[in-house]
Amino acid sequence: MLEAKNLTCIRDDRCLFQQLSFCIAPGEIVQIEGPNGAGKTSLLRILAGLAEADEGQVNWRDNNIRRDRAKYHQDLLFLGHQPGIKSVLTPFENLLFYQSVFQKVDSAAIWQALAQVGLVGYEDLPVSQLSAGQQRRVALARLWLSPAPLWILDEPLTAIDKQGVSTLLALFVQHAAKGGMVLLTTHQDLGAVSHNVRKICLANTQEKSCLSACCAVN
């Protein structure tokens, strides 16, 4: 279980959210919602252990992630706004490197991942020669290779076509059905899977100078 406990985040003297607490249990898909500037990306980075909250803590399996960040990151797949891939390598080489860090290399699984994101035929081109959308798909292909139970994804559906979105949403549901956890932000309609998604809204209450959180379940 992932637990956010009394998180407060202040950026540039502005309070984005305050005393924010929630849990994500195995089998859940959770969407963080809110207007631009509400702190969605900041929250994801805090939960991923890539940034510090001004107050509060993040627990993974009842342990503060600060105690063993490396072990926590073994259980986590984080995809941010930047694809986080090496431009001098090909899509296949990028996925080969990623897979070798966490598990035994399986070339067939890499080919399958490339096929899922529509990159068959581009596997031998340097990533620097691919479009921004194609580079994004290289990063997303890691989802088919990752053994991590916890996925934290910042706008994973951006620059993805309708068929690609459907494929990703089906993968999220499959991952959750196996006991995994998916935490994401997106501006896109989750359509048919929205009934499986719990939403946490970072909403401006207007009565306070700080953005607080409210939770709603579809």
From Swiss-Prot:
PROSITE patterns: ABC_TRANSPORTER_1, ABC_TRANSPORTER_2, CCMA. Its main location: membrane. It catalyses: heme b(in) + ATP + H2O = heme b(out) + ADP + phosphate + H(+). ATP binds at G34, P35, N36, G37, A38, G39, K40, T41. GO terms for cellular component: plasma membrane. Keywords: ATP-binding, Cell inner membrane, Cell membrane, Cytochrome c-type biogenesis, Membrane, Nucleotide-binding, Translocase, Transport. This is Cytochrome c biogenesis ATP-binding export protein CcmA. It comes from Yersinia pseudotuberculosis serotype I (strain IP32953).
